[in-house]
Amino acid sequence: MKQNSNIPKITMTTNGYRLNKIAKQLYNYGLDGINISIDSLNRETFKKLTGHDRLPEILEGIKILQDLNFKNIKVNAVLLKDINDTHEDFEKFGNFIKNNEIDFRFIELMQTGDNLDYFKRYHVSATKFTNYLNKNNWVIQTFGRDAGPAKNYLNPKFKGKFGVIAPYSKDFCKSCNRLRITAKGDLRLCLFGNTGISIRHLLQKDDQTEELQDLIMGQMKFKKESHYLELGETGLTKNLSTTGG
């Protein structure tokens, strides 16, 4: 894809399944970054959450990428009440990144159109994790204009970084620089917005680029300053699996 287009950077989001089998291929094909979902480093807890016992394979895949000097590795975990939100859990993830150049990010559980019961049961504020960071000498990192929604924290004793994505925090949307495209080809100005417009018809040919750009720029004036998740308004998003970053 990179060889035949003007796309300068390609990253991949994955649950890590078969990563130990394809890590070398991904590296050789020129992948620039990888985001891997690991909600727990406890093997039994991981198995209960995912329904499979593949944590060792996923960690092996990460090790293979590191041995290849692959730098841009991010690990994401959804912060879940009574599952991975204890001091011991935070310490375990800290030990994981202490000697590894890995960005580990906790994502605050978000309500969507179809997960209200799950959200009520497992949501816990991201401040529980940020309080831990502040008490343990982690310092927030200044971020550039092209940075994502995570606030990153550094500690001189650790090679890796901690990050937090806290959509319910004050001014979370203030620095938003994201648009979303669903699997069906709909442009969403906000992950939790109430409107969307199809751009699928403009993704068919190379000579449609200018028309596509004009459409997107025209839609930008409708981008709102904030979502309304704190009011329980989840917009068009029924579940996050249909929407890309």
Where are these regions (language model features)?
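Auxiliary Fe-S-binding modules of radical SAM enzymes
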Residues: K92-N99, L109-G245
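Radical SAM/AdoMet-radical enzyme domain recognition
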Residues: M1-I107
